[in-house]
Amino acid sequence: MPASTLLQHAQIDWDDQGRPHSRQYGDVYFAINEGIAETQHVFLEQTRLRQRFANLAPHGCLVIGETGFGTGMNFFCAWQLFAETAHADARLHFVSVEKYPLGHADMARAMRLWPELAAFTEPFLRQYVAVHQGFQQFTFDQGRITLTLLIGDVLEQLPQLDARIDVWFLDGFAPAKNPDMWTPELFTQLARLSHAGTALGTFTTTGWVRRSLIEAGFTMKKVPGIGKKWEVMSGEYTGPPNAPMSAPWYARPTAPEGPREALVIGAGLAGSASAASLAARGWQVTVLERHDAAAREASGNPQGVLYLKLSAHGTALSQMILSGFGYTRRQLELLQRGQDWDACGVLQLAFDSKEAERQGRLADAFEGSLLRAVQRNEAEAIAGVGLPAGGLFYTEGGWVHPPALCKAQLQHPNIRLLAHHDVLALRKADGLWQAWAGDRLLASAPMVVLAGAADVKRFEPCAQLPLKRIRGQITRLPVTDASRALATVVCAEGYVAPPRGEEHTLGASFDFHSDDLTPTVAEHQGNLAMLDEISTDLARRLGTAALAPEQLQGRAAFRCTSPDYLPIVGPVADPAAFAEAYAVLAKDARQVPEVPCPWLEGLYVNSGHGSRGLITAPLSGELIAAWVSGEPLPLPRAVAEACHPNRFGLRRLIRGK
């Protein structure tokens, strides 16, 4: 659990040469005329990065770790060198920690100092949104470049990272200016994340830093510096191999053997995201969808809401939501605003005293750039309509047309979508997973991702997953001249969105018992009653009193949720063999048997996103790809484990159920 969810941005002063100075550290971020040259000398040349990039095999990935993202200069220089020298099918994954991220305006101002890096800074700035505490992942160049920012204190963030770092950029302000970072605990983490041959470059030549790095397992040497810096240091990890980070039931499975081909079953948000993340890593992906097109079930609503139901206590679900929200928002920047999505904000009304109390705790726990409390008069000014109360305003929230996001994710040239392919059974033969419909073989591949919501339970390895279907119905309301005033999504027990085209979306009901997806008049009436609770003014503007509920248009679909409300994302084990391998846990839950997990090689699941799929599904695609490829996980290790399919098998053993 993170020590703090309260983000602090960098406090910047600009000198007469245009250089940014940190008020927190009392130091300059880079030399005005030598910054790029210094980065190239200390970090690129001393770690032999040009050679490492050139030696990358097709589909190979080099992982760089950095302390102190700052203005991003080291990242952009590394990206530029990678673009010049690496194989077209190779990848770069850059992981960087930053305690005080620059605001967008300061970041943009710094980047104007490097016009020669514009090809790299401009796409970054376009996605530099929704950067909040914790793990924040970015994707560039059609997935060829991944940036994972760990926002927070380095000694809180690095221990949560599951990664195998090839090169370290040991940056950040000088030890004298930033003593809290330069500690033995930091060097222990660098060593934990390294392997034999991991390279390291750093500006500092301070004696105790050098000695501490050597003690942690690095072989260090001083080398000639650049400009006013006489000497710098470079090194290599030569210490002992590091122990696994986790218990065997959460260990990384070996990568599937054979061709880089995968099946994804289901073309909703989870399936589309899984396909996109694998395709970006060079996999040829076949998506099998039983309907005539993607996003025909729960992902097919005309408008979904980017609403963050957070906890003030830094729970695994809250961390997942915060990381997933940022990732989705950055993906949406590539779509058509107004038609595919809109960052109009989300207003959550404090509709009773209990909700007001909950919102007060959240307003104290999170920074104002994410959410802020607003009184009724300000809430009405934001929304453009009359409201019964104030609440929390999520500035970066909004609505999304989910089919547009699915379609965009499926457009990668490595993906083919096969509609009207309803997979009824999976079989493993000759190292391949075979997808069958009766006696008809639909497709086969060494790897498969089950992404069909609750229908993943039709396949034996996932039959015991405790997934639950909850029916929900939305109502589509024709826009009026008066209702166009609604300027933000407003939520209470339900939600209403500003118009997309000529319709508002209103919803959504919760029915735990019905399996019938035919829209009902009763639920249209229930949705209209929810609208009255949200805003009688808006209901009047929409003329709902004159609308005949039986004439209203809408759609119903099943949400798919798990008992702990976290998605189920990761590799799948053989249930019977798992129970046998770890049977001792039934007697002593503290035992960690040294028994490898009986994985069903190449089988993964991505399901259970409930009503949060827009926020959790896209990042879960990256989590699936990281499990498969051995890349850094896009979430803290504890959060990835909290989403792991094996959590339920463990609970059954420990609780004796």
From Swiss-Prot:
Which EC number(s) does UniProt give?
A: 2.1.1.61, 1.5.-.-
Going by the UniProt record, its keywords in alphabetical order are:
Cytoplasm, FAD, Flavoprotein, Methyltransferase, Multifunctional enzyme, Oxidoreductase, S-adenosyl-L-methionine, Transferase, tRNA processing
Determine if Transit peptide is one of this entry's keywords.
Answer: no
Cofactor section: FAD
| Region described as tRNA (mnm(5)s(2)U34)-methyltransferase: spans on this chain | 1-238
**Which InterPro entries does its entry note?**
FAD-dep_OxRdtase, FAD/NAD-bd_sf, MnmC-like_methylTransf, SAM-dependent_MTases_sf, tRNA_MAMT_biosynth_bifunc_MnmC, tRNA_MNMC2, tRNA_S-uridine_synth_MnmC_C
On whether DNA-binding is a keyword of this UniProt record, the answer is no
> Which terms under GO biological process does the entry name?
methylation; tRNA wobble uridine modification
Primary site of residence: cytoplasm
What are the boundaries of the region FAD-dependent cmnm(5)s(2)U34 oxidoreductase? Answer: 265-657
Query: Which terms in the Gene Ontology molecular function aspect does this entry carry?
Result: flavin adenine dinucleotide binding; oxidoreductase activity, acting on the CH-NH group of donors; tRNA (5-methylaminomethyl-2-thiouridylate)(34)-methyltransferase activity
Cell location: Cytoplasm
State any GO CC term: cytoplasm
Reactions catalysed according to its record? 5-aminomethyl-2-thiouridine(34) in tRNA + S-adenosyl-L-methionine = 5-methylaminomethyl-2-thiouridine(34) in tRNA + S-adenosyl-L-homocysteine + H(+)
Q: What does this protein do?
A: Catalyzes the last two steps in the biosynthesis of 5-methylaminomethyl-2-thiouridine (mnm(5)s(2)U) at the wobble position (U34) in tRNA. Catalyzes the FAD-dependent demodification of cmnm(5)s(2)U34 to nm(5)s(2)U34, followed by the transfer of a methyl group from S-adenosyl-L-methionine to nm(5)s(2)U34, to form mnm(5)s(2)U34.
Q: Which family does it belong to?
A: In the N-terminal section; belongs to the methyltransferase superfamily. tRNA (mnm(5)s(2)U34)-methyltransferase family. In the C-terminal section; belongs to the DAO family.
Q: What is this protein called?
A: tRNA 5-methylaminomethyl-2-thiouridine biosynthesis bifunctional protein MnmC
> Which species is this record about?
Pseudomonas putida (strain W619)
